[in-house]
Amino acid sequence: MFANFRNCFKIKNSRLIYDNINKCLLTKEETNQLLKFIHLKWKPAKDQVQISFSRSSGPGGQNVNKLNTKVIVNLPFKQLESCIPMFLINHFKTCEMLRNYRIQNGIKIYSQKTRSQHKNIEDALNKISDLLNKSAETLYVPDTPPEKIARISILKKESNEKRLSEKKYKQKKKTQRRITMD
């Protein structure tokens, strides 16, 4: 039931801030949808994004100076509602991993890796896909294997026994210090 607690707490300005525990609790259906999303490695279609072009910077000579090869891809969250579960969209809106790419109502990615517009469009769409998949993976915490649970219980038991033996040792030491007056 408790899928992930690390997203519930954020360290900010040296203090722990509680951040709505309901965001971290995923139902079985949501967990299945999440795993399906991660497994499929979802990639936005060109009709789901808004693409614009501008002049690229850096080396490239006349190609850089005259052609608009830099690609700016905006992915509005409204476009995601038809193909991605709502709890994931809400996660994308608040996820720390996407904070540098988030704009008011979507995600904005730049690409000027190559000298071709088409390759830069593909690169930008791949960047969006990778970012959203990595962000979704932070929500999933697999079940603890039984071997690890058994090991943890053994360690707890040993720790408790050690604590009790130290306590008995201190008690015995104090009783030996007492002087009995007969």
From Swiss-Prot:
One Gene Ontology molecular-function label: translation release factor activity, codon nonspecific
Organism domain of life: Eukaryota
Ranges where the record places region Disordered: 161-182
Record function comment: Has a role in meiosis.
InterPro entries: Mito_Release_Factor_mL62, Pep_chain_release_fac_I, Pep_chain_release_fac_I_sf
Segments of skewed composition (Basic residues): 169-182
Species in which this protein is naturally found: Schizosaccharomyces pombe (strain 972 / ATCC 24843) (Fission yeast)
Protein name: Meiotically up-regulated gene 82 protein
GO process terms (BP): meiotic cell cycle; mitochondrial translational termination
GO cellular component entries: mitochondrial inner membrane; mitochondrial large ribosomal subunit; mitochondrion
Keywords: Meiosis, Mitochondrion
Record's subcellular location: Mitochondrion
Family membership: Belongs to the prokaryotic/mitochondrial release factor family.
